[in-house]
């Protein structure tokens, strides 16, 4: 199996999005939070009541204000992914209000075999200093626009937002292997987009 980074690893890409891009899209995502929350979701997660809970029922890359950033192609162009010809990307927005948190977790259970995925996040907006806690670097200051890539077994968390200003980030699960065989058709069409290097085009199926 081809792996993107070490499954326990952690890398940072500086200025994946510009400060101006982040300042432009963050308020639009906050504006549309209620629309994302209205999407039917039968799943149970630790994030009920937040847009993070909705990660499996839509793809934020199809949002009208996110699409022009061409994030799928930017991901495919990363040095870490240059050896790959195609990717399947699941993407969502995290909007943490006062008291909200993202508990400690990994994106694959340590006892499960490797899936060939990497978990990514880009911090967009928040008041004051905000941090993500990674298993290797510990308490790590979030820099607007920086992309963090962690392996599927790398433990990380975001502690409670102590400000009244929402904390906003984009998150991506990048898959090397087509997830279609392991999920329903409905879930597949809502949750993932497919980007191919040969055409520089993505298959986008849903809109928010």
What name fits each language-model region?
Residues 82-189:
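Catalytic core of non-heme Fe(II) oxygenases with the double-stranded beta-helix
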């Amino acid at each position: 199996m081809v792996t993107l980074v070490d499954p326990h690893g952690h890398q940072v890409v500086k200025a994946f999005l510009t400060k101006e891009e982040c300042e432009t899209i963050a308020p639009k995502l906050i504006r549309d939070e209620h629309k994302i929350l209205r999407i039917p979701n039968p799943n149970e997660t630790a994030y009920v009541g937040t847009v993070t809970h909705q990660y499996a029922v839509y793809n934020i890359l199809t949002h009208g204000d996110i699409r022009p950033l061409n994030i799928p192609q930017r991901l495919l162009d990363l040095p870490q992914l240059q050896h790959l010809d195609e990717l399947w990307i699941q993407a969502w927005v995290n909007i943490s209000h006062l008291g909200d948190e993202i508990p400690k977790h990994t994106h694959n259970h340590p006892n499960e075999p490797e899936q060939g995925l990497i978990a990514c996040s880009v911090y967009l907006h928040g008041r004051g200093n905000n941090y993500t806690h990674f298993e290797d670097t510990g308490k790590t200051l979030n820099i607007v626009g920086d992309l963090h890539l962690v392996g599927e077994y790398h433990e990380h968390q975001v502690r409670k937002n102590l400000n009244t200003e929402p904390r906003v980030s984009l998150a991506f699960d990048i898959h090397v292997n087509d997830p279609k065989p392991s999920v329903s058709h409905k879930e597949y069409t809502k949750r993932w987009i497919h980007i191919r290097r040969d055409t520089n085009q993505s298959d986008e199926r849903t809109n928010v």
